[in-house]
Amino acid sequence: MNIENKEITSSWFTNLRDLLCKEFEKIEEEYAQTKGLKPAKFVRSSWQRNGGGGGVMSLMKGAVFEKVGVNISTVFGKISPEFRNEIPGAELDGKFFATGISLVAHLKSPLIPAMHFNTRYIETSKSWFGGGGDLTPFYPEKNETVKFHAAFKEACDKYDSSYYPKFKKQCDEYFYLKHRKEPRGVGGIFYDYLNNGNFEQDFAFTQDVGKALLSVYPEIVRSKLFLPWTAEQKEYQLIRRGRYVEFNLLYDRGTKFGLMTDGNVEAILMSLPPEVKFN
């Protein structure tokens, strides 16, 4: 396993965490100042994995972000024999290294979309990058969806013109609730097992995916920060959040990988919304 690659990827995910948390706290401050409220701040808690490594959870519950969590983790060790065939390159000895960032934002306003993002670097006897970002509006707006996709398309096109259509398709297929026969949201991009034989290029792309999210999502949140919403709209948001829960518990690879590698359960399930209704 390449020590330098592990160090620079882990360092980037920490840096991106700091940038995202700073921007989200800034949004909370902007809203709080107009309402005479005390702005919310992220609360951080670290955890250690018994088999090796650990992570830091950053959680904020505020007036804008009902619940937003930004997790970073760097874990290593051996995958249990019963799960080794599910992770490429882990079949023989089960050794693995994984570092990454995951972010889920659930907003108080039903007019502001929920958002999920993660990027990661994994080494077994093989190595690869994966991740992506997707948007889940409860009241979709075309221009908002176009803006979100355009940010990721720009990041993709910088490296390969085939990336965006391929990764968009993979996102649409991945974030699909088969039992409901419906998509979870309006998509974005999703990629996995990315290894073009050029670590520097694949890493630079993964960094640009993070920068794309940082450029577009705060803008979307701010555009609807002060729009009024009704009790009926909030009720609909809570019901639709149920789909989020269903996907994460039934299909999400990150959830499965975290549980297979004895990750921190609180961090793994951080993506679940704070309040939800099932009808």
Swiss-Prot record:
Key words, A-Z: Cytoplasm, Heme biosynthesis, Metal-binding, Oxidoreductase, Porphyrin biosynthesis
Residues engaged in binding substrate: 102, 118-120
GO biological process, one term: protoporphyrinogen IX biosynthetic process
Presence of keyword Cytoplasm: yes
GO terms for cellular component: cytoplasm
Pathway where this protein functions: Porphyrin-containing compound metabolism; protoporphyrin-IX biosynthesis; protoporphyrinogen-IX from coproporphyrinogen-III (O2 route): step 1/1
Protein species of origin: Rickettsia conorii (strain ATCC VR-613 / Malish 7)
UniProt keyword annotation of Manganese present: no
Role this protein plays: Involved in the heme biosynthesis. Catalyzes the aerobic oxidative decarboxylation of propionate groups of rings A and B of coproporphyrinogen-III to yield the vinyl groups in protoporphyrinogen-IX.
Gene Ontology MF annotations: coproporphyrinogen oxidase activity; metal ion binding; protein homodimerization activity
NCBIfam families to which the protein is assigned, alphabetical: PRK05330.1
Subcellular location field: Cytoplasm
Region ranges (Important for dimerization): 244-279
Superkingdom field: Bacteria
Pfam families: Coprogen_oxidas (PF01218)
EC number: 1.3.3.3
Cofactor(s) listed: a divalent metal cation
Subunit structure as annotated in this protein's UniProt entry: Homodimer.
Chain residues that bind a divalent metal cation: 106, 116, 149, 179
Protein name, entry field: Oxygen-dependent coproporphyrinogen-III oxidase
Residues the UniProt record annotates as site (Important for dimerization): 179
Reaction equation(s) it catalyzes: coproporphyrinogen III + O2 + 2 H(+) = protoporphyrinogen IX + 2 CO2 + 2 H2O
PROSITE patterns named among the record's database cross-references: COPROGEN_OXIDASE
Family as reported in the entry's similarity comment: Belongs to the aerobic coproporphyrinogen-III oxidase family.
Active site residues of this protein: 116
